[in-house]
């Protein structure tokens, strides 16, 4: 993607404040599984707040002040923005007010997006089955599903998705997100992974889900000459929001991609379809929460510009050839109009001369030159 396009996208989201956020009641401790690689806002309503963290993977440590971590930013109102979080940043996040009192505490498991298991319900693809953790005990690994997101289209057939997070449960104990449970333990299992499930949907249009933002048009995207593809990034799109793409007004669906029928584009599962890989020029439109937010127009190639120039030049030459004949026709038409006009003037004057107006006795002379 062109650097300017990335720059515009990076400025768009902070200005509009549309980061996906999670919140926790003041004074409470909340536990949440999320996905790595997807921006998140940890809510803390305390202006001038200080944040402390403790990453639970790796060596044991203690709470440290959150400074100089490149992908984290404390917002003016006190919330913590984490851009492109990594699995290694799984851990504890504490928000303290400027008086030194704890406002809220989060336990966050950033589950590895690169291991995401994707299925489509209408294709008969099945989610992961429950398994036992290979530790010799009876810990159960299972998927805890989030509610279905809104349908990505209304009035027309669309799709919706839901996220499933890896959880581990011991007998008679409350389940925990997998990597918060495992902490420093080095355990490998193909079952320790998050999930994404998609299904078809068809709903009526309402105003409840719309973002109510103006859409933006990006011109002149080009396919990379070496790779022959380019990535398009939908502003405000997120794994946690409904996203939908058009290519020349043709819907791009998860069902087509996961069934192997569509090879001209690729919806990136790790971003929930926010990023689209395209292999041919077209007009691409993206929608977030059923609302158009961006349109991407392809750049015109030099070959196309040259062909258009040649076509315009040929049309101009044809017009010049036809110009003399058209001029003669126009001249003849003008002469005919002048002749008819002269005759009408003479007839009008003659009628006035023959029948003068009542009450007027004057001599009228018709002069014809």
Curated annotation (Swiss-Prot):
It is a single-pass type I membrane protein. The keyword Chloroplast does not apply. It comes from the Eukaryota. Residues 355-369 are cytoplasmic. InterPro entries: FAM187A/B, Ig-like_dom_sf, Ig-like_fold. The keyword Transit peptide does not apply. It is found in: Membrane. One of its GO terms (cellular component) is membrane. Keywords: Glycoprotein, Membrane, Signal, Transmembrane, Transmembrane helix. Residues 1-17 form the signal peptide. The chain crosses the membrane at residues 334-354. Glycans are attached at residues 45, 68, 130. Residues 18-333 are extracellular. Belongs to the FAM187 family. PANTHER family: FAM187, PROTEIN FAM187B. This is Protein FAM187B.
């Amino acid at each position: 993607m062109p650097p300017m396009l990335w720059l515009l996208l990076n400025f768009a989201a902070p200005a509009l404040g549309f980061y996906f956020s999670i919140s926790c009641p003041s004074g409470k401790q909340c536990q949440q599984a999320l996905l790595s690689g997807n921006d998140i806002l940890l809510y803390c309503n305390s202006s001038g707040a200080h944040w402390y963290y403790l990453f639970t993977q790796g060596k044991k440590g203690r709470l440290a002040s959150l400074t100089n971590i490149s992908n984290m930013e404390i917002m003016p109102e006190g919330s913590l923005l984490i851009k492109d979080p990594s699995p290694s940043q799984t851990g504890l996040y504490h928000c303290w007010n400027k008086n030194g009192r704890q406002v809220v505490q989060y336990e966050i498991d950033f589950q590895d997006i690169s291991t995401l298991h994707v299925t489509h319900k209408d294709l008969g693809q099945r989610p992961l089955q429950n398994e036992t953790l290979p530790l010799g005990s009876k810990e159960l690994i299972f998927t805890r599903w989030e509610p279905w997101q809104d349908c990505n289209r209304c009035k027309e057939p669309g799709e919706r998705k839901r996220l499933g997070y890896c959880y581990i449960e011991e007998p008679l104990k409350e389940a925990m997100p997998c990597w918060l449970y495992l902490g420093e333990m080095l355990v490998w299992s193909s079952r320790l992974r998050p999930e994404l499930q998609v299904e078809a949907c068809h709903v009526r249009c309402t105003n409840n889900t719309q973002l109510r933002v103006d859409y933006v048009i990006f011109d002149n995207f080009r396919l990379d000459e070496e790779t022959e593809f380019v990535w398009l990034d939908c502003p405000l799109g997120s794994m946690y929001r409904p996203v939908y793409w058009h290519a020349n007004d043709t819907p791009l669906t998860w069902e087509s991609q996961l069934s192997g029928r569509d090879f001209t584009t690729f919806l990136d599962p790790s971003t929930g379809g926010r990023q689209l890989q395209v292999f041919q020029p077209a007009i691409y439109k993206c929608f977030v929460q059923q609302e158009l937010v961006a349109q991407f127009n392809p750049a015109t190639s030099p070959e196309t510009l040259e062909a258009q120039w040649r076509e315009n030049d040929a049309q101009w030459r044809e017009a010049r050839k036809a110009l003399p004949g058209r001029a003669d026709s126009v001249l003849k038409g003008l002469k005919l109009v002048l002749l008819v006009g002269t005759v009408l003037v003479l007839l009008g004057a003659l009628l006035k001369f023959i029948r003068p107006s009542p009450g007027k006795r004057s001599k009228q002379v018709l002069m014809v030159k």
